[in-house]
Amino acid sequence: MKKLITANDIREAHARGEQAMSVVLRASIITPEAREVADLLGFTITECDESIPVTASVPASVPADKTESQRIRETIIAQLPEGQFTESLVAQLMEKVMKEKQSLEQGAMQPSFKSVTGKGGIKVIDGSSVKFGRFDGAEPHCVGLTDLVTGDDGSSMAAGFMQWENAFFPWTLNYDEIDMVLEGELHVRHEGQTMIAKAGDVMFIPKGSSIEFGTTSSVKFLYVAWPANWQSL
């Protein structure tokens, strides 16, 4: 049976101080999540065995309308010896990959950041340290959100970062909000009109607005909301 190279294998190797791993494709299966984690950690996976054509280890492009499970299944089958695997083996490998992917996504979507709070409650957040959580109000889209200043800081306002790619979702604001776009474009649809703010622009959205937040490309912005408990209103 082929050895399955998982994201945990990459993490463990990286924790040992290793920067690269050589993998014999004829005897191994590298999960998509393992490759993703390797990219995030700057870890190099070297695929050995030049006797196997590149097309044997790199599956053909998959149409966008295929489900995620179909894409994972085809990736696994492409790395198994032709005619030498069973459906039960494929199902077993798919289950392991899906669990690994879910674990990776949950770990990757935990909000965090570094900050220093000085005398009198003055707080400085290290913007480069911010890791995004997932905004439940935008499901099923993957919208990142991290609160940086909240009522826990003794503030009557809240502030944080949001970011996502190529998605729109409806939202009703029961609070006032000001957004400053840091990257990309923020689109707000309201009463048949679309307002667009680009990097460096500031947008005000008054309380009571029923809108669609979105972007046709990508966006990252700083939001300031009043009152601080805007998510529970």
UniProtKB/Swiss-Prot annotation:
Coiled coil spans: none
Pfam families to which the protein is assigned, alphabetical: EutQ (PF06249)
Pathway: Amine and polyamine degradation; ethanolamine degradation
Keywords noted in UniProt: Bacterial microcompartment, Kinase, Transferase
Intracellular or extracellular location(s): Bacterial microcompartment
Enzyme nomenclature, EC number: 2.7.2.1
The UniProt record lists the keyword Kinase: yes
Cellular component terms (Gene Ontology): ethanolamine degradation polyhedral organelle
A Gene Ontology molecular function term of the record: acetate kinase activity
Subunit structure: Homodimer.
Family: Belongs to the EutQ cupin-like family.
Protein's UniProt name: Acetate kinase EutQ
Species the sequence originates in: Escherichia coli (strain K12)
